């Protein structure tokens, strides 16, 4: 039997790292509608590019603190001194390109808000405003990208966001509950489905 069957969880999260298990059991796949929380998750997924998600999880609180709680109003005003400060902060992923992408993302988030656009509603529109519940019994059956993630990635890039290719965007969609990819043998699949009002 696989870990996914013996633990009652998705096979990808394993059974040994408490941080990973807690993330799977309480966060991953839960529908997120808060615009600021969605932007934070998009930034974190961008930081993950080329790295394992557990690396980001272990650094998340440090990244959040270094980026002023992911307050777009503050991050959007970061200058070269802030970039240098962040590049010297061992708590984060010290990539100039990723740091600059986060700053630009905050500026775009504010531009959208100031233009009366709801960042959350815009992102959720790519799945018709409701979570997609997949029927996979094994997490390895899930795709790495979909028509929706390709469309969202293209739209994000058109807006000026970076580190948001279709594979990163699909991982984002899974994490924020736009797609319920908890395998059907996982206890969270039905719980997340119920959260979305599809019990």
Task: Please identify what each model-predicted range represents.
Residues 1-199:
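HhH-family (HhH-GPD) DNA N-glycosylase catalytic core used in base-excision repair
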